[in-house]
């Protein structure tokens, strides 16, 4: 099959924003890139929030951006998938939950919901706990919540607010009670410090911990003792001197964290029959144990939101056509044009070549060398383009993002100037060879280096990113309202190659 060679050039951190003192892109001018956009026309793509499968209002990032580009669809992250299920009222019918509820009803036990109680959105979200409690209540199951306090992805003493919110919610909806509380330092260790987990285990299964009459009082007592959320020692809610929420034989447990790394060890303690890292004492014979996402396939547990297969990616479609493709970047972004663009696949596809150029190691921060390795990446790219016989090449240029993260505006301007010079060389070579140049970004950064108060902003922006297609003798018209997941179908459409069945994105070109 003979198709026009196409280079997808991802200018990492290149967003669109009004000119201003914090916009390194407009301060630099980037005349060569600006000229291409004027000549070829362009559109802007959403690259944050729900547009890339993140929760609404969350900024995009390089990992998510490249996955969406490579997948040719919106790749919903775990938290967003759960949010959508809650919004649609689908959580209560999830098989992992209905199976657990049924098993607990059969034994006459209770369901214990355990996990990180906050709205940090890194490991869990309090809204998910509330929805789970309602689902269990509606299924006729008694609910006990075991709250692991955050203080790391949230303020150090914000935990009492989350406990108040949940306790009030459970009481007003008659949907259960909070039975115990402990800091994530103990319940969510991931570094094999099993002594910490064993303290949380003793609280959960034996009711060991400082007693309290109510959960809010338990947190306030911890604060009075000088403990902050992350480090709150086990606290148990008691009535008549006895813990109200101990996990017993015949009960069921649902671990509601959606991030796996800090939920894995405690889960092993409940289900691993060969546990050898300390004395657990009596291990409850549970009616069931289920988790929000897959923490470890070896556990063999029911999972509410298992990993989504991402077949039919851009790289796979190209490989299935028997075509050669190139991935190239410097170290800082190499994983993004390989592993993440291939949606979690480590090994190259047949016909996929990879070129890694080392990022500078002679500086501590890239504001001291804003050129990074862009010139070496460009040199190698053009050598490969001239002689490699590739139908698709994907190149990431890292400067605008990595220098943007330093917040040093003069350095970011220099990074933009460097990238602009590389774009000129790349465009000249691609067009002279009769190829096609697709230019875009994964998220913004360098265009917004000051916040509304004029203070340095080093995080990614929420801005849209430009998208254009440049080729000799043809000017395209682009639609509005696109997302990163539309890029792969656009490239395939230009070749006349059908998008894969899994690609839900649509072409950005109208004519």
Curated annotation (Swiss-Prot):
This is 2,3-bisphosphoglycerate-independent phosphoglycerate mutase. Gene3D superfamilies: Alkaline Phosphatase, subunit A (3.40.720.10), BPG-independent phosphoglycerate mutase, domain B (3.40.1450.10). The gene is gpmI. The keyword Isomerase applies. Belongs to the BPG-independent phosphoglycerate mutase family. It comes from Nitratidesulfovibrio vulgaris (strain ATCC 29579 / DSM 644 / CCUG 34227 / NCIMB 8303 / VKM B-1760 / Hildenborough) (Desulfovibrio vulgaris). PANTHER family: 2,3-BISPHOSPHOGLYCERATE-INDEPENDENT PHOSPHOGLYCERATE MUTASE (PTHR31637:SF0). Binds 2 manganese ions per subunit. Monomer. One of its GO terms (biological process) is glucose catabolic process. Mn(2+) 2 binds at residues 12, 62, 442-443.
